[in-house]
Amino acid sequence: LDINGKEVSLSDLKGKYVYIDIWATWCGPCNAEIPHLKKLEKQFEGRNICFVSISSDRSREVWEKFVKNRKLGGIQLHMGNDRKFMKEICCYGIPHFLLIDRDGNFINANMLRPSDPKTREILKGFERI
């Protein structure tokens, strides 16, 4: 569910490249990536790349407060106690980043972090496609 309680599916994002961030409010390295992720979101705003952040926080209340206080952008989702998605993609630690193509297929299931300068260049390459 997103920050407004609306269900969001990957099929809703078809036609766009999707950069996914799996994170949690309590995760120091995750928090360190937030300013870099915000910068990427701003640079690619209105383009064919969508940014989705999926929180693995157990408490929806803690997550909602954090998202609102930090004014996080992109599509903000909360997985709660359901770790099915993380198991399916073999995600055993956070932060974890993924890149999905316009048809919903994985391009990279272990994508670089937003703080890595190569990430911007990779995403820029998809603008031309």
Each model region followed by its residue ranges:
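Conserved redox-active cysteine motifs that mediate thiol-disulfide chemistry
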Residues: 14, 22-39
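Active-site acidic short loop of glycosyltransferases
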Residues: 14-16, 46, 72, 91
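Thiol/disulfide oxidoreductase modules built on the thioredoxin-like
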Residues: 70-72, 79-126
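Structural microenvironment flanking redox-active thiols in thiol-disulfide oxidoreductases
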Residues: 32-70, 81-87, 121
